[in-house]
Amino acid sequence: MSTEKIADEIKFAYWVPNVSGGLVTSDIEQRTGWDFEYNKRLARTAENNGFEYALSQVRYEASYGAEFQHESTSFSLALLGATERLKLIAAVHPGLWHPAVLAKFGATADILSGGRFAVNVVSGWFKDEFTHLGEPWLEHDE
């Protein structure tokens, strides 16, 4: 296998900082911009440097310093409008979206962006996000 072939297969992505504070649970202080202007600059920089994907996380509340959160699907759609080639992957909790509504949103976003929208279905791990929104919490072994 040639080295050139391997290089063609490598794809780069980054995690969109659409929450305040930080992106991961950590005792280490984290500071990222989370406003739209910062994210537009970051998305365009990533796109211009060969990144193919960006993943927008979903949070409705967080205990790790991410006090404020932008909703992942609408934030991703806005970033798609600010870029030309970058593909946006929006994380969603399936229990909080009716499947038909998510399918319709996703199909529309994909058409509007020229095929650059995708969904990452996640199980979620903050119990309060579900219970505070009136959804049942299933233990992860259920």
Regions found by a protein language model. Give the residues of each.
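N-terminal beta1-alpha1-beta2 module of alpha/beta enzyme domains
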Residues: 1-82
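Short, well-ordered alpha-helical packing segments
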Residues: 40-43, 77-80, 93, 103-110
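Active-site-proximal glycine-rich helix-loop-beta segment
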Residues: 50, 84, 113-115
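Hydrophobic residues within beta-strands of alpha/beta enzymes
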Residues: 54, 88, 117-119
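Conserved catalytic cysteine-centered active-site region
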Residues: 82-90
